[in-house]
Structures are given as structure tokens and as C-alpha cells.
């Protein structure tokens, strides 16, 4: 990536999909993990912040608010604007909410969580509250939303963990 200070999101799952793709670092490709059992779709593009390691040992998860869905494998320069706090059966699993830095007419002026309609934040929160409901042995506990400053902390922690692991 050209700018080491720029954040990039790698999209695993496009907005509107029920398919859950995950990046497999051993294969170097995205793999279809499963189709969601519930009749819900991802409310935003979903993936991870490149060159980070989250508290769960995986790259830091993110959602990218886009006017139109992209595609699995798309890399988007992003700005973080908040964090959705949650845990799943594996532990802490926070999601950084981002906007694209690509001239998106809908999200170009968003720079903090307060710039997002409360109804959309509720929709995203509801999705993560129920999206695993029908999967045996899977569960989520949702917290709430945090602001841009908290997102910056989560990403700094994730970048430091990645740097430490990379040696």
C-alpha cells in the first residue's frame, strides 16, 4: 500500500449479502465460510483493517458505509468514525465503522459517529444482535456505539499488535 499512515479496508462481504466470506492468510484468498442462517443481510460492506490484529487475534473487523456495495477483495481507503462494541462465542469482537475516502456522495462529509443517522446505527446494531441467532453454538452480546476517538484507539492498538507480531 502506498501510504503507511492511510487506513485500508479489505472487503470480505459486500453490503446486502448473506454469504460470509473470510480471508484465509494461508491460502491468500477469500473463502466462503457459510451463508447466514437468519434471513438478514449485511447492512454495510464488511471486512477488516489491513495490517492490524484485534483483541481476538484476527485483523480488526470493520464496516464501510457505502452508497453501493463493492465486492469481496475490494480494498478501500477509509476513515474510521466509530466502533460498535460486541462479543461473540470467541470473545471481544468490536467492529470499527468507517467511511470511504473515495468521493462517496453519501458519506464524504461523515467524520464521527454523530454524523450517522441514529436509525442506521440501530439497524447495524440489530443486525449484529440477531445475525447468529439460528446457528448452533453461536451467540452475540452487543454493547453500544463509541466515537471516533475510541476508533482511533482500537486501530492504534491493532496496528501495534500487527507490528509486534511481524517482528
Model-derived regions: residue spans:
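Hydrophobic N-terminal alpha-helices or hydrophobic patches in metabolic proteins across all domains
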Residues: 1-167
